Regions:
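TPR/Sel1-like alpha-solenoid repeat signature
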Residues: 74, 81, 93, 110-121, ...
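DNA major-groove recognition helix of helix-turn-helix/homeodomain DNA-binding modules
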Residues: 42-59
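Short basic helix-loop element that most often maps to the first helix and adjoining turn
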Residues: 1, 5-22, 80-84
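C-terminal non-catalytic interaction modules
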Residues: 1, 8, 12, 36, ...
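Amphipathic alpha-helical segments of tetratricopeptide repeats
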Residues: 95-102, 135-145, 175-186, 217-228, ...
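Short alpha-helical DNA-recognition segment
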Residues: 12-34, 95
């Protein structure tokens, strides 16, 4: 760990702002440059900072030398682009950093480039290549014996599993990441908060809103003192999703609107589109499909401009649902078909199953019961495999009512029983 990284981690773990660390004798801009290894402090300055951070001076003196300036700049750029979900540009930044790594470069610099490449590949849905980079990163972290780096590998693995919609694997990876970062000394409070956000998001997707809220409120306690707009935007977004699933709609809407404001302030268009999509979903769920569709269309325009196929697929599924609710079956069919096409292209079984469920409802409305039954059966199989108890309960109920119309009371009864079991599983897990 370089001197700048060590000072930054110690400061954040103690909840100290750059201004407070600067005190009356140093400037806030000096602390910022120091944390990015852009200035070399005097021994006396190091002694002052060590005292304010409660660290032995020797711990600052034995820090690793920083990587070359060009490599550091590219790593910082890549990480900033990852936070904005600009994965192609992030990939290019990390590839340039990799080309600039000199023989004998610090292992931590090699680690950060390797993990950055893995995360960019994850965002681009190149999962096999991403896994290879994460495996290399894990080996480097273990060679360095650094629990904070082991936590970053586990967190990246969790994001990969989330992207693949393997929710149990994501939960396990984020749990490992949390244990690892808490064993580091000092603990990076910002990164711990981000792991808690992602663990909360995973619980929310698993249909476990109570556990999600516990993680997210714990994240709030870590992040609010740090005033990091990006992290706070993600926190409020995921709180909004979790409260929406608890049917606390007004609380959810307030969090989602706050997230949208924070993302817009950062000009983070990808996450702004995600927040608007979630606000649209909330309005549709509250019986306002036309108003919700307006927000969904705004989200769609941004997703198209960013070439975000996953965002397009997710938004199209929700637009199809809104169209179905207002009785525009032609539009609903077009939107659901395109969502399915994109989800299959992305190899995203969860999104494909969600769109298939909407298509099944369209077929049901049109009286094409056999096709509707086949689509419900496919969606149910996918959600069972993904351990998505809430979705299993919902699809089982819808499928059961369809079978009642077809006169298949026995099969319908089994599906209703499956819906009750899935609901009980979700409640028990909370």
């Amino acid at each position: 760990m370089t001197l700048g990284e060590r000072i930054r981690q110690a400061r954040k773990s103690r909840g100290i702002t750059q201004r407070a660390l600067a005190g009356g004798d140093l400037s806030e801009s000096f602390i910022s440059m120091l944390e990015h290894d852009r200035v070399r402090p005097s021994l006396e300055t190091l002694r002052v900072l060590a005292g304010r951070l409660g660290l032995p001076l020797a711990e600052l003196l034995d820090a690793e030398p920083p990587p070359s300036r060009q490599v550091r700049v590219k790593i910082d750029l890549g990480n900033a682009l990852l936070r904005q979900h600009r994965f192609t540009e992030a990939m290019e930044a990390f590839q340039e950093a990799e080309r600039r790594l000199a023989p004998g470069s610090p292992l931590e610099a090699v680690f950060r480039v390797t993990i950055g490449l893995g995360q960019a590949l994850t965002g681009l849905s190149h999962f096999d290549l991403a896994e290879q980079h994460l495996a290399k990163g894990e080996a480097l972290a273990e060679a360095l014996g650094r629990p904070d780096l082991i936590a970053r590998v586990a967190s990246a693995a969790g994001l990969l599993s989330l992207r693949k919609r393997d929710l149990p694997a994501a939960r396990d990876a984020f749990t490992r990441a949390l244990a690892a970062i808490r064993s580091a000394d000092p603990v990076d409070a910002e990164f711990e908060g981000r792991i808690l956000i992602n663990l909360g998001r995973t619980y929310s997707d698993l249909g476990l809103p109570a556990q999600a809220l516990h993680c997210l409120e714990s994240a709030r306690a870590r992040l609010e003192p740090l005033h990091d707009l990006g992290a706070l935007g993600l926190l409020h977004f995921n709180l909004g999703v979790a409260y929406e699933r608890q049917r606390a709609f007004e609380v959810a809407r307030a969090h989602l609107e706050k997230a949208a404001v924070l993302f817009e302030a950062q000009e983070n268009l990808g996450l702004l589109a995600t927040a608007k999509r979630s606000l649209g979903i909330l309005l549709v769920n509250r019986g306002q499909p036309r108003e919700g569709a307006d927000l969904l269309e705004q989200s769609m325009r941004v997703a198209v401009s960013l070439a975000d196929d996953l965002g397009r697929a997710q938004t199209l599924t929700e637009l199809a649902r809104a169209s179905l609710l207002v009785g525009d079956l032609d539009a609903a069919r077009r939107q659901a078909e395109e969502a399915i096409r994109l989800a299959v292209k992305l190899q995203n079984p969860t999104e494909a199953a969600r769109a298939e469920t909407i298509m099944a409802a369209i077929c049901h409305r049109e009286g094409r019961l056999d096709e509707a039954a086949n689509r419900y059966a496919y969606a149910l199989e996918q959600f069972e495999r993904l351990h998505a108890a809430g979705e299993v309960a919902r699809v089982s109920r819808e499928y059961g009512f369809l079978l009642l119309e077809r006169g298949e009371e026995g099969r319908a009864a089994r599906l209703f029983a499956r819906a009750f079991r899935a609901q009980d599983e979700a409640v028990a897990a909370r």
